[in-house]
Amino acid sequence: MEQTWRWYGPNDPVTLADVRQAGATGVVTALHHIPNGEVWSVEEILKRKAIVEDAGLVWSVVESVPIHEDIKTHTGNYEQWIANYQQTLRNLAQCGIRTVCYNFMPVLDWTRTDLEYVLPDGSKALRFDQIEFAAFELHILKRPGAEADYTEEEIAQAAERFATMSDEDKARLTRNIIAGLPGAEEGYTLDQFRKHLELYKDIDKAKLRENFAVFLKAIIPVAEEVGVRMAVHPDDPPRPILGLPRIVSTIEDMQWMVDTVNSMANGFTMCTGSYGVRADNDLVDMIKQFGPRIYFTHLRSTMREDNPKTFHEAAHLNGDVDMYEVVKAIVEEEHRRKAEGKEDLIPMRPDHGHQMLDDLKKKTNPGYSAIGRLKGLAEVRGVEMAIQRAFFSR
């Protein structure tokens, strides 16, 4: 695997010098300063590429080229936004950057309720608490019809939890959910959030798939033409939330994408932490079935709690993800490609990490502190080395 590291650009508290010292060779980054929907110019792409290369690294993967909400709702200037997206892909290819991670999650990107969940060892992790999320949706957002998405027990527990919250607790929970986490391209006030949800009131799973198909049928031929590999990121968490449909959550969703546009440019990001939240997702089977189309991997683990919809981010080698079997399947896919004469490695980044040690005293991007990811990268690197030596060195 190619060892990579997500970097949020010049304002990231983790520097490119830090990235290089961590042992990564590739950088995963994006032009976050360019508004959603606008074309990434060759000039801006080359400027960022030069910064990365001057640090002795390569820009391996774009994460992400965001998809404008008009495309997802099939409204407004969606045709222009699609044309802009096509041009951005052409410009990236012209600059030699050919792997693009993206997602099709409506309104919200990845979602957590607690950004400072304290683990028994004193380090901090990200957490999604189903009951706190219900408290937000039922008692703060007050979304009409939300009760239908929860059990009677969850509704009662959410009411109890809300009753114990201080004003600061409520503000923090709201901020965590709607203000935008690292890598998310949208942040909202509560009123803006309600208005954006309203845009989806008539969009169910079938309609969102229809809109996604329009996007794929416009984008994938361009990607194929210029040699770009599109790698869709799964929904996080991988299930409907806030009345919004989610359509990249299961192996059936992956198959639907392939059936809709059967091109090798139409591929996947294997994010084990996102897919792995669902107990019915067999990660190794996903890799084996769609291995030739996996162009990027995010390796992390989560731990489901007593309520199976509540989870926290575990250490990379712990939790519900069998990281050994996952890495073994990825390495096997790389060797399959090598046997076909393809030398390209699959870019891997240690996705998220616990805030720990000296980073507990620093301002960090949630999930993206240096030391926790350094630990994760070292652990995954060790797993890969052991697998390579045990199975492929003869």
Swiss-Prot record:
Top-level EC class as recorded in UniProt: lyase
Example of a GO biological process term: D-glucuronate catabolic process
Pathway annotation: Carbohydrate metabolism; pentose and glucuronate interconversion
InterPro entries for this protein: Man_deHydtase, Xyl_isomerase-like_sf
Keywords assigned: Iron, Lyase, Manganese
NCBIfam families on file: PRK03906.1, uxuA
Name of the protein in question: Mannonate dehydratase
